Amino acid sequence: MWNRRKIMKNRKKVVLILMYCFVVSIWLFGFMPKIGFDSYLTKYPIPLTMIPGGFVSGFTICGGGAVSFPVFCKVLKLDAMMARDFALGIQSFGMTCAAITILIRKIKIEKRVAIFCTIGSIIGIFFGNVYIVPIMSSENMKILFSMVIAAFGVSLFLNTFCFKERRKYICETISDFQMKTVGALLIIGFVGGVFTSVLGTGADIIAFSIVTILFRVDEKVLNPTSDIIMAVSSVAGLLMRMYVFGGIHKDAAASFPLAIPIVIIMAPLGAIMASKLKRLSVVKFLLFFIVIEIGSTFYSLQLGNSQKIIVGSLFAGLLLFYFILFKFSEIYYRRNIMENIRSVSYTHLRAHETSAH
């Protein structure tokens, strides 16, 4: 028995090593002959950005695009379209490696959330590329990114500091899974997919922030689940940009391969660090990062009074949405408890009647 476990463990290690060798081979023989190693001398800020970017993608549920997008747009002053395509490209490698690692190591995920949110996300990415991307300006993309990050921050803050009691009743899978649950997950995935089509990230953030609240699924289970959603969404988004919607931004195509060897090292390091820290420490780090990101957006864009009112209204609407979501979750949870109590009581009554006869 012990030998069998040792063999299985060694097999997993071999598969992971082969996966990393395969990715490095693609980078070394597929991308670098076209790009050239001298690109590191002229584009060094991009791979340097992905050192913290890759770490954050492993340390939190956010993909590497959550770091690269604001840094590229606000610090390096690069085009938002380039930042979006870069995020899709680098996540297609980094998040896919993470997803394969999760599956090989049999880390617990909520399979139904992964399946239906991913299906919804792919549909949303296509829809967003057709109807939303053509009308989005770079300025609006930056504001939208801050709204997505703010949504995550609000849900994280409320879940951690305002509704502590509900954490006693979290579960590893969605209880009372019905057809309407499938519909809800498809819609959640669709919304995340639309954001991903515009920003290069978002499917994981939206799925995580809503499912943890609405269905009370354990964050430790949803974290790897959201990685799988974002991995498939990134690959789908990149392929759509390449073959359906006119190709990816030329600067992104020449830049994201430079960061591939970095993210496949930094992301696992981030995951290891996160596993050793308490949840509250990770939450505080995330909230600090989110406040800095939102503050830098308002500072860099110099919004007019009317724009500030619109953004403020959106943020207020976001708060209201999550409070409603929390209350709906409370009602949904209490109703399920009452139904379970009735079901158990009815079963006991029938058993008593049968034994009496």
Residue ranges: model-predicted function:
Residues M1-G53, K74, A80, I104-G192, ...:
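Juxtamembrane transmembrane-helix boundary motif
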Residues I51-I61, G189-G200:
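Transmembrane alpha-helix interface/packing and boundary motifs in multi-pass membrane proteins
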Residues S57, G94, A98, S121, ...:
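Residue-level signal for conserved functional micro-sites within the alpha-helical transmembrane segments
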Residues T60-F69, V198-F208:
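Transmembrane helix boundary and interhelical junction motifs in multipass membrane proteins
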Residues A66-E110:
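Juxtamembrane transmembrane-helix termini in multi-pass membrane transport proteins
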Residues S68-M82, I206-V221:
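Interfacial segments of multi-pass membrane proteins
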Residues R84-S92, N223-S234, I290:
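Transmembrane helix-bundle signature of multi-pass membrane transporters/permeases
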Residues T347-T354:
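Conserved small/polar residues in nucleotide/adenosyl-binding loops
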